[in-house]
């Protein structure tokens, strides 16, 4: 197969019942996958960010019906009509960088933020759904920072991970990078999927001969949202990427910690007498706010709550969240 190594964990009724891991963490197969190996979970990070958002809603700090400019005045100069809920549900029309991807370090937070502040949306905010694959990081992340005062990753570390002993990080300390499993692109060099499925595979994973073919069969919105210029081939394994806080895509953690985190949410939002948030707030956050069709993801009818991907994402070809059942919530990701 194409996997060098992997891990899977399951919690049931508040108890860990499965924690499996195996294989290797690099292409040279010189390091075995261990219990504490960390993996970049990509867009699963959006659900973790969603937990942080839900927590500050729960605490009365954020009102999702207010305009973004109420909390972030600079954003309102070019986007005066955008509501907070538009950012949280991929309906802000800001799924790409109109002037091209900023040329900077992943740690240059303000550069990304100012680029988005200075542009107008592709569509009228609230009028359509278009998956904000990476721009979600700086749109939702900067909103969060303006409201709470901390970056999402710092808040998650202080208020969630440390409370429940979770080995999950948005912005990984450099002294922990040795535990990371590398993302391998060469494993896909000989991949020859059917034509219909090429468009569903992230461009950075495709061999060169299929990249141009893909660009001809996907929408302009997709190309804006998944602009390959944002990534160099080694970026996901770089110190810069792992240290940065990219709350749409670069969460690093263990399967066991993710299972525990969502296990807490699914069993009353409390563990060891420590309350994470109110169940009523979680229920509101995980109810459907938008159903698509999604202009970035091929017109798919993807259901979102407040950052969370929900059940009901089937298309004729692909279900973007195949393990999410009725009343379930989380997020799909390529990690």
Predicted segments, located by residue:
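Short, conserved catalytic-motif segment at the N-terminal edge
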Residues: 1-42, 61-66
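The feature captures the short pre-catalytic strand/loop hairpin that immediately precedes
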Residues: 28, 113-122, 232-241
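Flexible glycine/proline-enriched surface loops and loop-helix/loop-strand junctions
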Residues: 34-36, 119-126, 136-139, 238-247
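Active-site helix/loop module of the DD-peptidase/beta-lactamase fold
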Residues: 35, 40-44, 56-100, 117-118, ...
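Active-site-proximal alpha-helical segments within enzyme catalytic domains
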Residues: 90, 136-143, 249-270
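Internal, well-ordered domain-core segments that constitute the primary functional module
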Residues: 99, 114, 120, 125-145
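Active-site Gly/Thr loop motif
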Residues: 186-255, 286-335
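Short acidic alpha-helical/loop segments enriched in Asp/Glu that coordinate divalent cations
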Residues: 270-284, 297-299
């Amino acid at each position: 197969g194409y996997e060098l190594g992997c891990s899977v964990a399951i919690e049931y009724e508040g108890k860990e019942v499965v924690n499996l891991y195996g294989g290797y963490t690099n292409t040279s197969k010189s390091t075995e996958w261990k219990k504490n190996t960390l993996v970049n979970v990509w867009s699963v990070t959006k659900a973790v960010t969603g937990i942080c958002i839900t927590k500050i809603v729960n605490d009365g700090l954020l009102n999702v019906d207010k305009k973004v400019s109420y909390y972030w005045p600079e954003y309102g100069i070019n986007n005066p009509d955008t509501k907070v809920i538009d950012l949280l549900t991929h309906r802000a029309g800001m799924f790409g960088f109109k002037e091209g991807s900023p040329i900077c370090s992943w740690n240059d937070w303000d550069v990304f933020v100012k680029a988005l502040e200075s542009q107008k949306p592709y569509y009228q905010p609230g009028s359509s759904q278009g998956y904000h694959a990476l721009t979600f990081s700086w749109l939702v992340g900067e909103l969060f920072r303006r409201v709470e005062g901390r970056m999402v990753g710092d808040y998650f570390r202080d208020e969630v991970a440390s409370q429940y002993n979770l080995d999950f990080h948005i912005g990984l300390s450099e002294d922990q990078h040795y535990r990371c499993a590398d993302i391998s692109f060469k494993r896909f060099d000989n991949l020859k999927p059917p034509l219909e499925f090429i468009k569903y595979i992230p461009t950075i994973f495709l061999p060169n001969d299929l990249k141009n073919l893909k660009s001809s069969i996907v929408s302009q919105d997709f190309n804006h949202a998944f602009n390959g210029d944002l990534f160099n081939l080694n970026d996901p394994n770089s110190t810069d990427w792992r240290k940065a806080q990219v709350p749409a895509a670069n969460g690093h953690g263990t399967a066991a910690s993710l299972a525990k985190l969502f296990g807490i949410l699914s069993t009353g939002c409390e563990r060891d007498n420590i309350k994470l948030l109110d169940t009523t707030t979680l229920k509101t956050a995980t109810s459907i706010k938008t159903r698509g069709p999604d202009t970035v993801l091929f017109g798919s009818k993807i259901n979102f709550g407040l950052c969370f991907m929900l059940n009901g994402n089937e298309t004729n070809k692909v279900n973007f969240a195949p393990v999410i059942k009725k009343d379930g919530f989380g997020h799909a990701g390529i990690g």
